[in-house]
Structure formats: C-alpha cells, structure tokens
C-alpha cells in the first residue's frame, strides 16, 4: 500500500503541474481528495491492514494528503496571479492619453439674470441678503402690514403648511429679518425662490424674485426713482423710458408700479405691450411707518424705500421669451441658447 500511495502522489503532482486553469485544478482536487477520490479510496483499505501496519500507512496517507493540498493551493495561487497579470496587460490603459471631453454646461438663464441684476445693485451699494423659503406668517405678512383679516392677503395665493407656517410668497420677509438684526443704515437686495398657487403661460407656482430695501435718514422718493432708473438704464440699455404709476402695497406708502418703454417696439405699441408702449417690470414705494414699528425703527427719524421684481418677468423681457414654462421644462435646445 505504501507503493500505491507513493505512485498516487507522483501521478497527482505531475497532473497538478500540468494544469493551466482554476477549473482544471478544481477537477484534480475532486479527483484525488474528494469523497470519491483516489486517496479516499486508498484510505478506506486501511481496515484490512495489520495493527502494526495501520498507523504507519495512515500517517503516510495523511502526509500525501497534506502534500497534495499544499501543492494544489500553491499552483492555484500561481494560476490566479498569471491570469491577473495577463488581464492587466490586456486591459492596460495609457494614462498619458487625453481624457474624454465632457460637454460644457452653461448657467441657467434665471441664474444669469439674478447674477447680472445683483451685480448692478452691488455697484449701487447694495449687498445680498438671504432668508428661509419656509416662513412664519409674522415675517411674510404681519410684520409687513398684512393683519390677519386684511383683504390684501387675498392678493396672494399662499401655500400654507399650518396656520402660522407657509412657503414665502415674496422675499420681503428677508427685509424684515434684516431690519430686526441691523440698525440703519440698511441697503440690501434679496434674490430668491418664492411660491404662489398659480400656474399658466405667465405664472408658475414657484418663481424667483429680487427685492430691494434702503433705509437711512433723509431717503426720499426721488432717491427711489433715481436708483431704479439707473438700474433700468444699465440692464435694458441707456435711453429706455421709465415711468411710475400710483399703486397700492400694504407695506409701502406711497406705492408705485414701475414701467419701462416696451423693449420690443421701443414704445411705439405692439402685441407684447398691448399697444400701450409700456411694460410693467416692478413695484416699489416708500416703506410704511407701520413696518418700522414692527422692527423697532423710529419712523420719525428714518425713512426708506423698497422695491421688488419677478426675475422670470425681467428675463422674458430681456430675451424675448413668450412662455414662462420654458424656464422650467429643462429643454436643452432652449437652455443652450444662453
């Protein structure tokens, strides 16, 4: 039986050395060391040996088994290493080659308009202030002279979370928060997203506004008109006509709607301006004393103005866009034009 074990070992080692794949080595492991393998068959014959021969042959069989397992594991590691080297050689990358060129993105037209308007007002001494989009009723309405029973609240279709929390309907709450934190003088603009329950070709339930605030001693309506005229001339071009019409906003008094000469027909009258020659772009006015009282300012010693414009409205006039929904449809053909 010793000769049989020695012959089995030599034959197995030779076959293992000749195996060139993991599959072949696995088959040899089963052939020699499996439950029905050659070595297992030999060890089953130990019972027929004498008591003196059995431990000697059994120890030899275990030695053969250990040698075969060790050689199988070593050869398997070599085969796997060779396979890995071959794959790396086959899939080798030339790291000196230039990378794939990705298409360049562009800024969204709304972002471009916000940045351009912000830059103009920065040149006029205004800084950018921001605030939360989910607001308290106090900041969005009450502090801006919208009492709970005020009919002016019906002018805005509001998304309410509960009785006191809502999605802001304008960025004016930023002005209230700023005045509560800072003493005059204050000069800010507050660009941001606002929400109203409205949706059609010229309205969206989510849109963008830029509102401005200036509070100091001796601020007049003439200052308001001068700053807004300066903005219009910088943004739409010099020589654009500007007019102010009386209007109403709960947080300003007096209040005005600001129109510019139609950028499409140069004031001659067309379909866009409904033959009037004028286009409304923003609302403005002198801050109501009641707003000052809510933020702790003394209306007897300071004065100021506020204004606000819809960014989409300005962008539509700037670029001649007829449908507000184009800004939100994510149509690459439209966005690539900017």
From Swiss-Prot:
GO terms for molecular function: ATP binding; magnesium ion binding; phenylalanine-tRNA ligase activity; tRNA binding. Binds 2 magnesium ions per tetramer. Mg(2+) binds at residue 253. SUPFAM superfamilies: Class II aaRS and biotin synthetases (SSF55681), tRNA-binding arm (SSF46589). Its EC number is 6.1.1.20. Keywords: Aminoacyl-tRNA synthetase, ATP-binding, Cytoplasm, Ligase, Magnesium, Metal-binding, Nucleotide-binding, Protein biosynthesis. GO terms for cellular component: cytoplasm. GO terms for biological process: phenylalanyl-tRNA aminoacylation. It catalyses: tRNA(Phe) + L-phenylalanine + ATP = L-phenylalanyl-tRNA(Phe) + AMP + diphosphate + H(+). It is found in: Cytoplasm. Its cofactor is Mg(2+). It holds the Pfam family Phe_tRNA-synt_N. NCBIfam families: pheS. Belongs to the class-II aminoacyl-tRNA synthetase family. Phe-tRNA synthetase alpha subunit type 1 subfamily. PANTHER family: PHENYLALANINE--TRNA LIGASE, MITOCHONDRIAL (PTHR11538:SF41), PHENYLALANYL-TRNA SYNTHETASE (PTHR11538). Tetramer of two alpha and two beta subunits. This is Phenylalanine--tRNA ligase alpha subunit. It comes from Geobacter metallireducens (strain ATCC 53774 / DSM 7210 / GS-15).
């Amino acid at each position: 039986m010793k000769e049989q074990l020695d012959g089995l070992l030599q034959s197995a080692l030779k076959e293992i050395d000749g195996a060139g794949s993991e599959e072949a080595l696995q088959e040899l492991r089963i052939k020699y060391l499996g439950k029905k393998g050659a070595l297992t068959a030999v060890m089953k014959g130990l019972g027929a040996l004498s008591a003196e021969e059995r431990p000697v042959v059994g120890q030899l069989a275990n030695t053969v088994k250990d040698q075969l397992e060790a050689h199988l594991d070593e050869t398997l590691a070599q085969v796997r290493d060779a396979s890995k080297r071959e794959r790396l050689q086959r899939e080798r990358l030339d790291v000196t080659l230039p990378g794939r060129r990705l298409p360049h993105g562009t800024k969204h037209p709304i972002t471009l308009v916000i940045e351009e308007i912000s830059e103009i007002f920065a040149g006029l001494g205004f800084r950018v202030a921001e605030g939360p989009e989910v607001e308290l009723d106090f900041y969005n309405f009450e502090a801006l002279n919208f009492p709970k029973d005020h009919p002016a609240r019906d002018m805005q279709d509001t998304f309410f979370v509960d009785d006191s929390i809502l999605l802001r309907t304008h960025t004016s709450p930023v002005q209230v928060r700023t005045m509560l934190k800072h003493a005059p003088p204050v000069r800010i603009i507050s660009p941001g997203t606002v929400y109203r329950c409205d949706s059609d070709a010229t309205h969206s339930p989510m849109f963008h506004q830029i509102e401005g605030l200036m509070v100091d001693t001796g601020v007049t309506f003439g200052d308001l008109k001068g700053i807004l005229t300066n903005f219009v001339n910088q943004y739409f071009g010099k020589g654009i006509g500007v007019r102010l019409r009386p209007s109403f906003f709960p947080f300003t008094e007096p209040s005005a709607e600001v129109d510019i000469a139609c950028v499409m027909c140069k004031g001659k009258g067309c379909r866009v301006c409904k033959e009037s020659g004028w286009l409304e772009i923003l609302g403005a006015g002198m801050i109501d004393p009641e707003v000052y009282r809510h933020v702790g300012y003394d209306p007897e010693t300071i004065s100021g103005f506020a204004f606000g414009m819809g960014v989409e409205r300005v962008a539509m006039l700037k670029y001649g866009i007829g449908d507000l929904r184009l800004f939100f449809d994510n149509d690459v053909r439209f966005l690539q034009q900017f």
